[in-house]
């Protein structure tokens, strides 16, 4: 019997990415409650362990496989880890959309359900972080501050109800997670500013969250510039009541619009996409979906 698929929601960049007072990385992944990518994961018994991810070369399966084996070793079923895991619909890699974290998280959750394991989301995330710097994706209704190196994390506040109208600034480019680790040290001059940004996030006030996200994107553009950033930033400043979100180690940017969406803001942003970017936006949603 084939089990029904499960889905782990993804993300579009980060609300904020910075460092704490010790210089350790802190990531507030912008997890979404609705995404056009809609990944699905199937977990079924087999004669041996296999991981299949559609449209991806075999080497890109290794992280998910390593996470599975970490779980199996930790919970005593390494001798019986015989499953066929198929992952369909993951976002493109190297873009800041959380594809490898989606793959690992969904495989681990699928095995937890299949084997009825008593393992927390915290422990699953720590396993993911053993494999690589990972996004915390398990509670999309919240904004979570996470250390992607050791897996520690804290729920900061509820995610605001926003629509994200986003685009890939460089479709032909990808950014490897490992290649961007040096950005942690380059953020050190902005440590005090990140502290202020974190405080704004903790208020839960949507206007301050939008300001914090925009400021984090501005700081990040000094470190990893994105095509078209200044034009997008200018529009955000003109409109005043929206935010700008960045994939801090990827290629995507997005406008954050509180719901219900202001009609004038939507018109201006639609014109920006039509005339400046000459493409349609990719739409994501955060917070509660009616």
Which residue ranges define each predicted feature?
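ATP-binding N-lobe of GHMP and related small-molecule kinases
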Residues: 1-94
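Short beta-strand segments
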Residues: 9, 31, 139, 166-170, ...
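Short beta-strand scaffold segments in enzyme catalytic cores
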Residues: 12-18, 37-42, 136, 142-146, ...
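Long, contiguous secondary-structure blocks with strong helical propensity
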Residues: 35-46, 61-68, 81-92, 104-115, ...
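DPxDG-like acidic metal-binding loop motif
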Residues: 97-121, 137
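ATP-dependent small-molecule kinase catalytic core of the GHMP/sugar-kinase superfamily
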Residues: 119-242, 256-290
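Small/polar glycine-rich anion-binding or flexible loop at a beta-alpha turn
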Residues: 246-254
């Amino acid at each position: 019997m084939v089990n029904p698929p499960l889905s782990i929601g993804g993300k579009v960049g980060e609300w904020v990415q910075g460092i704490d007072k010790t210089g350790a990385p802190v990531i507030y992944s912008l997890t979404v409650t609705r995404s056009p990518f809609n990944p699905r994961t199937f977990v079924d018994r087999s004669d041996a362990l296999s991981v299949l991810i559609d449209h991806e070369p075999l080497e890109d399966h290794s992280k998910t496989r390593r996470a599975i084996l970490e779980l199996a070793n930790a919970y005593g079923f390494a001798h019986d880890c015989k499953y066929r895991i198929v992952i369909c619909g993951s976002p493109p890699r190297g873009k800041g959309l959380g594809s490898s974290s989606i793959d690992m998280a969904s495989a681990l959750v699928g095995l937890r359900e299949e084997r009825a394991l008593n393992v927390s989301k915290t422990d699953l995330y720590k396993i993911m972080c053993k494999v690589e710097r990972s996004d915390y994706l398990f509670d999309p209704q919240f904004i979570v501050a996470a250390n992607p190196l050791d897996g520690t994390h804290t729920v900061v506040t509820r995610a605001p109800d926003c629509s994200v109208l986003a685009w890939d600034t460089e479709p032909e480019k990808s950014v490897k997670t490992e290649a961007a680790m040096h950005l942690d040290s380059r953020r050190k001059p902005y440590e005090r500013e990140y502290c202020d940004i974190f405080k704004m996030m903790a208020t839960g006030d949507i206007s301050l969250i939008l300001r914090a996200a925009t400021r984090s994107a501005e700081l990040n553009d000094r470190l990893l510039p994105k095509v078209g950033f200044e034009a997008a930033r200018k529009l955000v400043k003109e409109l005043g009541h929206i935010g700008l979100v960045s994939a801090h180690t990827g290629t995507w940017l997005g406008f954050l619009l509180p719901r219900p969406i202001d009609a004038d803001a939507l018109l201006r942003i639609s014109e920006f996409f039509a005339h400046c970017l000459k493409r349609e936006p990719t739409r994501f949603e955060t917070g509660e979906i009616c």
